[in-house]
């Protein structure tokens, strides 16, 4: 649905990825612009579950228009998707709703759960695992395994780290952010929170991923440079994520 970093691409959306398995639909992240993109491919009521990796606005902001749609245009008869939030996500979302003075039931529009990152969960036919990764707020990478054993691992937003290498070992598809251009960007008290394309490629190579895809990079960057840097790190071709791109795992 969208691959943009915090500043959305022109005509694009922030983080949002639709995963389907055996008629079950899960939306992974729901950043700015994702809900509009979602409506181009399916009814909002067709989504069975929404999984949020961390509580940065470019990964959850469109839960607000999503909730409005479920509360009003689709009415009380609409099925409520499961909303799987990271630890502390329910309280933060409730505070945001209160501060904005939103008059519709954002939390009540969904079946809200906070997932235990240390546990293995199921969502329909999908098996979910989580791994905390270094970012500016607490963030969890996730693995979605299908009924036939295919594994899709999403690194969320993170700096290079060994924990994700171990977590993603031999995955079928590893999708990693490539936010930084060519050199690390350090902020928030010397904490690094993102990767370059080369970092992402190297992490995918170390993990032994069968395929690697790069996401969360700006349209201000030259996509061919992003690709070449990622491939230099991975040692094999990489995919550049864009709206409408489909993978089979």
Stretch-by-stretch model annotation:
Residues 1-43, 140-156, 173:
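Conserved beta-strand hairpin/beta-sheet module of binuclear metal-dependent hydrolase folds
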Residues 22, 47, 76-79, 148-150, ...:
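Short, surface-exposed connector motifs at secondary-structure boundaries
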Residues 27-31, 48-55, 86, 152-156, ...:
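Active-site neighborhood of phospho(di)ester-bond hydrolases with catalytic His/Asp-centered motifs
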Residues 33-82:
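Active-site metal-binding motif and surrounding structural segment of the metallo-beta-lactamase
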Residues 42-45, 79, 108, 124, ...:
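Structured loop/turn residues at beta-strand edges in well-structured enzyme cores
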Residues 75-81, 89-112:
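Active-site neighborhood of divalent metal-dependent phosphoester bond hydrolases
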Residues 113-170:
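Catalytic core of the metallo-beta-lactamase
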Residues 159-246:
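Cap/insert and terminal regions of metallo-dependent hydrolase folds
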